[in-house]
């Protein structure tokens, strides 16, 4: 079943108007982001599914993750978002530790991103996939031979560890481009 994540500046606004049931972890606690927008067995008092999300998936229930992504706080309009996405970011900024540590999903990976030097959304998506447990074994290959050397293996499904699908990684790479351009835009506004 597909993994669906939907990003929001504030997920509570969407959930306030959408009838849903909260997903449950296998520890019996509420899932941080997952909800069901269809009928599923649930506790009517807590509004939490009585099936953990893995069991629910095996029975054909479809969980959607509603994620808070604060990057979108600085986006003013749909047109502004499109402009931020369309603008080529200053990729070299990712090699600056202070800048890299402000960036969604790559903070803490300054040393590796400085070695690999992604220069496109596709390469940044590969970088995001590389830092997941299921693909870390490809890091030395990429360090030695570049992103082209891993492009056939990076998107192959793995059963033993968590990995990013290409669509997921590419989406997050686009969010990073938006964030990079927002930071630069905000700095430009300060100097004007």
Placement of each model-derived feature along the sequence:
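Mg2+-dependent phosphoryl-transfer active-site scaffold
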Residues: 1-192
């Amino acid at each position: 079943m597909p993994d669906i994540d939907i990003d929001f500046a504030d997920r509570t606004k969407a959930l306030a108007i959408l009838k849903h049931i909260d997903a449950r972890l296998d520890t019996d606690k509420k899932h941080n982001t997952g909800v069901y927008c269809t009928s599923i067995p649930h506790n009517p008092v807590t509004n939490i599914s009585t099936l953990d999300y893995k069991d629910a998936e095996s029975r054909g229930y479809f969980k959607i993750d509603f994620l808070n992504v604060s990057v979108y706080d600085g986006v003013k309009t749909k047109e502004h978002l499109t402009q931020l996405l369309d603008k080529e970011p200053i990729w070299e900024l990712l090699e600056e530790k202070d800048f890299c540590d402000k960036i969604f999903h790559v903070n803490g990976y300054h040393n590796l991103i400085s070695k690999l030097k992604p220069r496109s959304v596709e390469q940044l998506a590969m970088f995001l996939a590389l830092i997941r447990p299921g693909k870390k074994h490809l890091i030395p290959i990429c360090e030695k031979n570049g992103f082209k050397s891993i492009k056939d293996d990076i998107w192959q499904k793995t059963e033993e560890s968590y990995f990013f699908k290409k669509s997921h990684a590419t989406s997050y790479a686009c969010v990073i481009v938006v964030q990079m351009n927002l930071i630069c835009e905000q700095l430009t506004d300060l100097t004007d």
